Amino acid sequence: MRAIAHVSIAAMLLMGSSGRGSAQTPTDFFKGRTVDLYIGYSVGGGYDVYARMIARHMGRHIPGNPTIIPKNMEGAGSIRLANWLYNVAPRDGTAFGTVSRGAPFDPLLGSPATQFDGREFTWIGSANNEVSVCVAWHTTGVARFEDLLSKELVVGGSSAASDTDQFAKLLNALFGTKLKVATGYPGGNEINLAIERGEVGGRCGWSWSSVVATHKHWLEQNRIAVLIQTALSKHADLPDVPLATDLARSEEQRQIIWLIFARQVMGRPFMAPPGVPPERAIVLRDAFMSTMKDPQFLADAEKAKLEITPVSGADIEKLVKEVYRTPKETAAKAAAMIR
């Protein structure tokens, strides 16, 4: 792994402004171009659905109206894409992506697969502030969180870097649940198919917005039980489902829970590589937030049952830096729990 300089995103943006073509106006630069939107998961999952919806509308809000092309680059729970964006992708504003909300924090947690510093990405925004859940299939005999203390539930996972794996392992370490992770599925869509086939009995780290958007019929037909919410606060739809944060028994547990679940604030994050010229970074940020208020986008999102509670790129940048200030001892304990 090459050495990663701890440079602020502001400095990286200033460095990028000296590059070729910085004298162009954003309209001149983006006119007639295509912008690639990379998705760190397979087709059909929650990250993919959100990204493709945004790709259909965001180009209208970028000066010059470029065409945005969604492309999937799944692998290693989206760490493959995060590494590529950081080290390989063009830094001129023509490439950005969406990765697991937890991926930017993996270097802090000691993941050997990461080749980036989450603080240095050009953060564009998030489509929502997310709540995730653990669910169990109706035939497993697991109907509530307390059942997990005495009965093993096999849950599907994407990789050691994904919420699907990390949240289940954290619950085991903190509360003594008996969640067994069967990992290696390319994305959430494949995990859901595995649940239907009986390969696994449920999943953790499943975004509630994705549950409602893609599998609301499972809820309506009582085919799954929602066991626990893994976030910093409850979702309004789930007042009677326990929140992991409320189960903490010590200040140390609360600190670890905050470290791992703070990512939920940036539920569907979008970022460009470090070093994007500052005027283009501003354009992408503004275009993203304008898209989040676009009546056509919101109408399409409502039809698709996508929850839209946007978070600005500036707020994400602030959050990521705050999480990276976690004491090393706390981060090390959290890392041991989720590996």
Where do the PLM segments sit?
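Extracytoplasmic "Venus flytrap"
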Residues: 36-50, 74-77, 156-163
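Short beta-strand->loop
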Residues: 119-127, 178-184, 214-263, 312, ...
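Sec/Tat signal peptide C-region and signal peptidase I cleavage site
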Residues: 19-23
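Bacterial N-terminal signal peptides
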Residues: 6-17
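Hinge/capping helix and adjacent helix->loop/strand transition within the periplasmic-binding protein
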Residues: 35, 60-65, 84-95, 103-198, ...
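An extracytoplasmic/periplasmic, membrane-proximal ligand-sensing/linker region
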Residues: 31-33, 220-222, 247, 265, ...
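A ligand-binding cleft/hinge motif common to bilobed small-molecule-binding domains
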Residues: 101-113, 165, 169-174, 202-247
